[in-house]
Amino acid sequence: MASQLTDAFARKFYYLRLSITDVCNFRCTYCLPDGYKPSGVTNKGFLTVDEIRRVTRAFASLGTEKVRLTGGEPSLRRDFTDIIAAVRENDAIRQIAVTTNGYRLERDVANWRDAGLTGINVSVDSLDARQFHAITGQDKFNQVMAGIDAAFEAGFEKVKVNTVLMRDVNHHQLDTFLNWIQHRPIQLRFIELMETGEGSELFRKHHISGQVLRDELLRRGWIHQLRQRSDGPAQVFCHPDYAGEIGLIMPYEKDFCATCNRLRVSSIGKLHLCLFGEGGVNLRDLLEDDTQQQALEARISAALREKKQTHFLHQNNTGITQNLSYIGG
């Protein structure tokens, strides 16, 4: 289906990132170093399964092909499997993925796959168990590794792993990561540390450009692959000697926003046109009944006309994003 979601800069949007909670049980240094603190949840709480069904149906009608369930930690929701199944009901949604810290993967991933999940991203910022504990505040490294193995055993052909690139923390561990993916079909995605409202000091201390890794990968014979229209923002590299791939997400690179293809809805039903944008468009009042779908689609389409050409991270403007758990990164 051709996307009806096209902005003023001719960008087409096939990809919805849907946050279903902002609660997380990890305390990652770059996201929630002091742990989760409730904020911004209305009296209605987080989106219900029925509301999720309605909002994804509207986006699918407008051309969305891929939905990623994010958080917080999505698997903290007891109805998470039901949420996957609700999104899966719509045949227009070809891909349903989750971004998770992985602590419930080993237990639940087979059920998620049976419900309709097609893709998994797991956050792993270090392959050293002690450093993993220091970064996340949780001694769960072995549990997360077992969860990744369980995903393969459940039938997932590829698992994506997200690694936030941090100077003097993990930027010098490329060889360790490459050894890990040599015989595993893992797409390891290094994500540049992004400045958020609460993370300015950490950013100044640990930010390093992904260009450093890209230059090294090219020097070693890795090959840049072409993007598909519903792919995320990663530049993906492959190598004939490796079963795995490397992805680089570099939001500070020139023209990063030119290929933007994704919109975000928060766990309380606000449409966000950019991770680092201002405000948000309330959709929740149009999620109460199936008869509101036409009005919901109209509001989404109208909001898209206001999407800016680029973020303003280079001007140190992080918008409303105080931390990355707020609207799902």
Swiss-Prot record:
The keyword GTP-binding applies. [4Fe-4S] cluster 2 binds at residues 257, 260, 274. Residues 8-234 form the Radical SAM core domain. Signal peptide: none annotated. S-adenosyl-L-methionine binds at residues 30, 72, 123, 194. Pfam families: Fer4_12 (PF13353), Mob_synth_C (PF06463), Radical_SAM (PF04055). Its EC number is 4.1.99.22. Its cofactor is [4Fe-4S] cluster. GTP binds at residues 17, 68, 99, 160, 262-264. It catalyses: GTP + AH2 + S-adenosyl-L-methionine = (8S)-3',8-cyclo-7,8-dihydroguanosine 5'-triphosphate + 5'-deoxyadenosine + L-methionine + A + H(+). One of its GO terms (molecular function) is S-adenosyl-L-methionine binding. Binds 2 [4Fe-4S] clusters. Binds 1 [4Fe-4S] cluster coordinated with 3 cysteines and an exchangeable S-adenosyl-L-methionine and 1 [4Fe-4S] cluster coordinated with 3 cysteines and the GTP-derived substrate. Belongs to the radical SAM superfamily. MoaA family. Catalyzes the cyclization of GTP to (8S)-3',8-cyclo-7,8-dihydroguanosine 5'-triphosphate. Monomer and homodimer. This is GTP 3',8-cyclase. It comes from Escherichia coli O139:H28 (strain E24377A / ETEC). The lineage of its organism: Bacteria, Pseudomonadati, Pseudomonadota, Gammaproteobacteria, Enterobacterales.
